[in-house]
Regions:
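Extracellular/periplasmic catalytic domains that process cell-envelope and extracellular macromolecules
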Residues: 20-22, 43-47, 64-68, 132-142
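C-terminal catalytic histidine-bearing segment of alpha/beta-hydrolase fold enzymes
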Residues: 73-75, 101-197
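Acidic catalytic loop of the alpha/beta-hydrolase fold
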Residues: 79-84, 152-154
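A conserved short beta-strand
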Residues: 47-58, 71
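Hydrolases whose catalytic domains are alpha/beta-hydrolase-1, hotdog thioesterase
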Residues: 37-41
Length: 198
């Protein structure tokens, strides 16, 4: 109830005179415990966010998992806590990815070979992996993972633009009955190129 009350209060108070918010583009992010909370809400309450992107903690399937589409990105550090530095061999990352791939309707494994896209974002993130779903002829990256080189359990400034570059392409609308419609835009909504996530 807190989330719904907070958003309702913000919608009532933010009228554009001081600030303006696009309530169709609410994103979740965080590091460490913040990442665990964000990814946890993505599992249990995906209706909170248009997309999530976080660093250094994962979530997995829970008893109250929603199994609904939620675009997600996770970055781990090469010297991070737990087993995350193991990458594809990490149990925590495997559990996170298994849930997220299933929730997003992608029938693939969390392996480098099964990733649909593999690219270098910058010198700290030379290996970014994406699992996509083709919707109306557009390859939509719904699950993305990267390892940040030489990073312990913290955030580097280079992590944040990567998370934003992922999340900014997604939006959502909530109908009166609570139905969620999600959108992906390759141009980050600068052009009329949005496709509905099905």
């Amino acid at each position: 109830k807190f989330y719904q009350s907070l958003v309702t209060l913000m919608e009532e108070k933010i009228d554009g005179s001081y600030a303006d918010l696009d309530f169709n583009r609410i994103y979740g992010s965080g590091q460490s415990a913040g990442s665990a909370a964000t990814q946890g809400f993505a599992v249990t309450n995906p209706e909170f966010f248009a997309a999530v992107g976080s660093t250094s903690a994962a979530a997995a399937e829970k008893e109250n998992s929603a199994f609904e589409t939620i675009p997600t990105m996770l970055i781990a550090g090469q010297m991070d806590l737990g087993d995350m530095p193991k990458g594809f061999e990490s149990t925590s990352l495997q559990n996170w990815a298994k849930y997220m791939l299933k929730a997003n309707g992608i029938d693939k494994e969390f392996t480098a070979e099964d990733a649909d896209q593999h690219f270098s974002a910058d010198s700290r993130h030379p290996d970014v992996y994406s699992w996509t779903k083709t919707i109306d002829g557009v390859d939509v990256p719904l699950v993305q993972w990267a390892l940040c080189l030489l990073r312990p359990h913290n955030c580097y400034p280079s992590d944040m633009p990567m998370l934003w570059d992922f999340m900014e392409h997604f939006s959502f609308e909530k109908a009166e009955d609570g139905t969620i419609t999600r959108y992906y835009s390759a141009s980050a909504f600068e052009r009329d190129d949005a496709v509905i996530l099905k």
